[in-house]
Amino acid sequence: MSLKISNFIDASNTKGPIRVEDTEHGPILIAQKFNLKDLFFRTLSTINAKINSQILNEQLKNYRLENQKSLLLFLNTLASEKSAESAFAAYEAAKNSIQHSFTGRDIKLMLNTAERFHGIGTAKNLERHLVFRCWGNRGITHLGHTSISIKNNLLQEPTHTYLSWYPGGNVTKDTEINYLFEKRSGYSVDTYKQDKLNMISEQTAERLDAGQEVRNLLNSKQDQNNNKKIFFPRANQKKDPYGYWGVSADKVYIPLSGDNKTKDGKISHNLFGLDETNMSKFICKKKADAFRQLANYKLISKSENCAGMALNVLKAGNSEIYFPLPDVKLVATPNDVYAYANKVRQRIESLNQSYNEIMKYIESDFDLSRLTQLRRSYLKSFNKINLIHTPKTFKPLSISLYKHPTENVSSEDFDAVINACHSYLVKSAPSNMTRVLNELKTEATDKKEEIIEKSIKIIDYYNSLKSPDLGTKLYIHDLLQINKLLLNNSHSNI
């Protein structure tokens, strides 16, 4: 029996060292509490880091072998389930702490790093999505960077919009101090490839080239005694096809609202997601302003540095509907905006998951006669709306008792469905929920943002119920179905 990542996740909830024990059925993980032996060797390790004693090294050797066995098994498992590159990145993130012991905290840190290495988010598998990229801030000597790209491969001519904000002009000794506070002209590069090249210094690139040269010599046995320091690349440092070093970013893939398709061709729809049109307009305008030298860059800024500009794009896409904007005090940083983008992603994914579960339940597991009875007060209007606006995906369930809708759909049809569903929810809910239910009631004339906010409230209300009855599930489903049609501008023909 081989171990899986899930076994390490289960073991990570303990505070003590995690070790491997071999059994006749295969290796198992043993989670222990810290004891005096662990404390003793941790202290020795700390002392030895300063004095580098050969005697202490021997004492620590066997103790560390126990940690290394657990660590190597974890890294091999991680490499097989994800990738060797992500396992390498995970090791880099935790290599200092695992010198003492291999703990649940180390597992969580390395799993999070491995997950971020290839990008997080279910939207990665979709043909339409937003990618937030972050090169993290590691202090004043490495400020980091952010960029945003919007991809749409569903169009006849696919689009890829990119924004990565930089200051114009060169920094000299005379302008170095003012560089932090003064406004300068701003501009955007057009590709992720350019960003990767920009994120590595000439000095680092030279060291990486020198290290590669030494390794090549040693591998060919032409120079066994070369005394140059071998400089190894990190997991996110790679050469491009032209021989230039670059640094990959941490990526967050965020869903866009509306119709979509998976990379294997499966049709999907996101009721919740960022607004592609608004964000694309913002990016195009900002780049046009930069071309006319009307756009600014300011490093110490809430909105005019790279992170602030990325935050502006998310805001244009209505991100604050899903999660409040971060409280930026003085300057927007890549790390803070990355954390915010990830929270937006998590909220959108959670809402879409709940929405899809509600849709799937009613549309696949239902009693036709019972649902027809529950819809009797608004069945005619419901069928008219659905048959006209979704003829290709419409199911027989909705057209029972009303097979020939010839009248035009009116706002009264939308109101009939909304009022009937809302009325049932109010009657079946506790009296203290009336205000909440009134806030989620959609009007056919509501703006797009209002419909999204009310759809979120519908989902949150549904998730707050412990055991909703069939009627509640159906009316929640129908309200969300109406909201979906309204968001698709179905009411523009009313």
UniProtKB/Swiss-Prot annotation:
Changing I458T: In plasmid pINV_F6_M1382. It is an enzyme of class 2 (transferase). Its main location: secreted. It catalyses: L-lysyl-/S-(2E,6E,10E)-geranylgeranyl-L-cysteinyl-[protein] + octadecanoyl-CoA = N(6)-octadecanoyl-L-lysyl-/S-(2E,6E,10E)-geranylgeranyl-L-cysteinyl-[protein] + CoA + H(+). Its EC number is 2.3.1.-. This is N-epsilon-fatty acyltransferase IcsB. The active site is at H145, D195, C306. Virulence-associated N-epsilon-fatty acyltransferase that mediates lysine-stearoylation of host Rho GTPase proteins, thereby disrupting the host actin cytoskeleton. Required at the post-invasion stage of Shigella pathogenicity. Contributes to bacterial escape from autophagy.
